[in-house]
Amino acid sequence: MIKNITGIAMSGGVDSTATAILQKQKGPVLGFFMKLNQPDYETQRDRVSQIAQKLDIKLEIIDLTEEFQEYVLKYFSASYFKGLTPNPCIICNKEIKFGLFQQAILRQGVERIATGHYAQIHKTAAGYQLHKGVDPHKDQSYFLSRLSQEQLAHSIFPLGGMHKGAIYDLVEAHGFHDFRGTESQDVCFLEQDNVVDFLEQTAEFSASSGNIVMNDGKILGKHKGLHRYTVGQRRGLGISYPVPLYVINLDVKNNNVIVGENEQLFHKTMAISDIHWISQPEREDLLHASVHIRSTHKGAQASVILKENNRASVIFDEPQRAITPGQFATIYKDTQVLGSGVIL
């Protein structure tokens, strides 16, 4: 392994461009770009190539199309087929960006890889800790909650201690004036976030209509497939009722969308499975922590009762709205990510 060479994960966005600028100031770098299932792959590739050329960075393209299909797309479709709401970004980070992509870069003789994520890594005597980025509006630590110690050991997050405004100032100072007002987007297989169109390209979702029902079994209407709905959804139900109704559950066994009033979305308890710890908690039976039930959730204080087989029961201090099976619950101690589990 060649010392002091940093790999840069480049996507063509403002964050990866700022990362490249910062790391190049510190020493030699190599740029890397992932080919996945991007709808606009050629446009994105050309954009990355232009940025790399302007910064005088050698760029290599790593094709992970088949692997992305296997690890991310299959998980995404299978989750909806089971009536779950997946988070493909978390799986992509674990298996692709910080998994196969990172491994491919390390084989090039690179020691560490810098990405444009808004998070921080702290090295301690006990290992590597993952912390929130200092910009609360851009923090991405939730999406990194499945990373391993080894993955963190080879990662650098130069933007974790910065705010977004400073990022724009930095790239503009280096001649990039077309980023202001734009946001970096994760490399994604969904064009314009059209989940339904993507899912209905697969046979499983071709003939899956069923009933929209109340908890007591009263039928209010028909749905066009469970994959079109998620817990907490109000729009697009196509039903009439004296008060607003929301999706409160997806009954896969009977192919029903169960709806109810807003207060029925609030719960104090949930179960999580497949817990992955970045940093082991001090106790093996119980911990008090802030738990985030989705990426946009601000977090809520809870008691996490640890059980066998990487499972836990979570009891919130206050009821939480729209706890959604399939999403990840990320466990924080102050700014530190301890780990995460899948909501059952």
UniProtKB/Swiss-Prot annotation:
Molecular function in Gene Ontology: ATP binding; tRNA binding; tRNA-uridine 2-sulfurtransferase activity
Entry similarity comment: Belongs to the MnmA/TRMU family.
Function: Catalyzes the 2-thiolation of uridine at the wobble position (U34) of tRNA, leading to the formation of s(2)U34.
Binding site for ATP: A9, M10, S11, G12, G13, V14, D15, S16, M34, G116
Record-annotated disulphide pairs: C92-C188
Endoplasmic reticulum as UniProt keyword: no
Keyword Transmembrane among UniProt keywords: no
GO cellular component: cytoplasm
Region (Interaction with tRNA): 138-140
Signal peptide: none
Location relative to the cell: Cytoplasm
Keywords: ATP-binding, Cytoplasm, Disulfide bond, Nucleotide-binding, RNA-binding, Transferase, tRNA processing, tRNA-binding
Full protein name: tRNA-specific 2-thiouridylase MnmA
Primary localization: cytoplasm
GO biological process, one term: tRNA wobble position uridine thiolation
Catalytic activity: S-sulfanyl-L-cysteinyl-[protein] + uridine(34) in tRNA + AH2 + ATP = 2-thiouridine(34) in tRNA + L-cysteinyl-[protein] + A + AMP + diphosphate + H(+)
Site positions per UniProt: Interaction with tRNA: H117, Q327
Annotated InterPro entries: MnmA-like, MnmA-like_C, MnmA-like_central, MnmA-like_central_sf, Rossmann-like_a/b/a_fold
NCBIfam families found in the cross-reference section: PRK00143.1, trmU
EC number of this enzyme: 2.8.1.13
Domain of life (superkingdom): Bacteria
